[in-house]
Structures are given as structure tokens and as C-alpha cells.
Amino acid sequence: MAGQASEHWKIEDLDFSRIAREQVRTDENLFYLVASASFIESGSDLYTQNLVDFFRGDDEVTGWLSNHWEQEELQHGRALRAYVRHVWPEFEWDTAYRGFLAEYATYCKVELLAPTRALEMTARCVVETGTATYYRAMARSTTEPVLRDLATRIATDEVNHYKHFYRFFRRYRAQERLNRFRVMGTIGRRTLELKSEDADCAIRHVVKARAPHRAGDAAYIQQLSARMNSTIRTNLSPGTTLKMLMRPLELPARVQTVIQYPIRQFMEHVFLR
């Protein structure tokens, strides 16, 4: 398949000795952006198993999930963890991650997936849109060369994952004869859930290890989350995000032009809240 013929990048391709530590060491907002992302990516194997179970019998999908998607997501986690350890070595990543994983595992349940395979592929497209947007914005938000390189590599991977999920979606949509109203419902619902349990869980456990005295301070954690969201919102590319969100609807160009503005408003007020 396209995108898999060329060799995927390796963590060894990143020269962590080039990190401009003095440039990012005191940037707490950046620390939380990178550390929380490293937790979520590192827990990808939990979610992969649920998806493999859900799509069991479709060897093309399950093979790609296990051999490509999961491996690349876990690599993202390892690379982000390595970056955290180089810049903030005092942060007890392993201890904090164990706490995160124990809670995160309770959110990864097959019964929480969409009711049909086509709709779950729709949801996957939304999630990949969110992650690609996150890492693109992270890359734009910093001038530190190693993080910029890493975030750009991850964003490129997420776009490639989106393309695979979208292709699988089209196959299942044809089989299920899915109408646009159901697709739109899944896009809206999954977009609303993008900043739900996993992101909140990651931030809480990073705070618990980084600033234990603030671990129970809901207002402080909310402020952190708001600053992180502001960074993403300031540095994203709305047009690209909007195009990715709308693509599963497969609307005629004329209709797409008409509904683009309200969907963009929805994206800005909910997806980026």
C-alpha cells in the first residue's frame, strides 16, 4: 500500500544531542504538551487490541493495525518519552506512566467503539485528524529543532494513518450502505469526545508526578489544559483540519461550500475548546 513501501523513520534518526535544552527547559506548557502526548501514544497497544477484536475476520485491516499502526504509535510514544528524559530528566516518567496506564485501561473497552465497522472507521478518521492537528501545531509552536523535527514526523505518520482508515471506511460504507446523516452524527459525537478521558487522564498523572501538591487542584489542571489548548489553537491550520473532518461525508463541492462555515464554527468552538 502507498506509504508503506518506503522505510519508516527510526528513533535513531533523531539526534537528541542537538536539543536546545536552554530553549525549552523552562517551558512548562511545552513540557505538559510533550509528556501527556507521550503517555497516550505509549498506551496505544491497549486500543489496538480492541480494534483488532472489533475487525476480526478482516485480515487486511487487522494486519495493518497490528503490523503498522500499533508499531508506529508505540514508536511515537518512545520517541516522545526520550525527548522528555533528555530535557526534563528529573521527571519520573515510568512511575507516572504506570499510574496513567492503570486508569487509562479502564477507558479502553470494545463496547465503547461505534456500532458498525464503517462508523468506527469514521471515528478513526476523526481521531487521526485530531492527532495530526495536535502534532502539526506542536511543531509550529516551537523553534527547538529536534522537537520540531519529531512533531513533524509524527504528524506525517498520523496523516498517513488517516488515509488508511479513510480507505477502509469507504469499503465498509459501501457494504453497509451508510447514509451521510449517520456519518455526520459519528463525526460530531467523536469530535466532542476528542478531549475526553484520555487527555484528561494523561494531564492529571503528569501533574501528579511533576507537581504532587497540585494533583488535587482541579482549577490548576483546568488552567494547564486551557493553555495547552490555546497553543494548539494558535498554531493549527484550520483549513486542513476542516478538510480532513469533512472528507468522510463525501459531499458534492457545491454542498460542501454551503456547510463549510457552520462546520468550521463547530470545529473552533468544540474541537478546539
Functional labels for PLM-detected ranges:
Residues M1-R273:
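Non-heme di-metal
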